[in-house]
Amino acid sequence: MEVGKLGKPYPLLNLAYVGV
């Protein structure tokens, strides 16, 4: 789970990324 990777600039995409 790369929460800190796309968590700052893209919070919504981060949730989708971790969901996948």
Swiss-Prot record:
Induction: Expressed equally in exponential and stationary phase in rich medium (at protein level).
Lineage top rank: taxon: Bacteria
Protein name as annotated: Protein YfiS
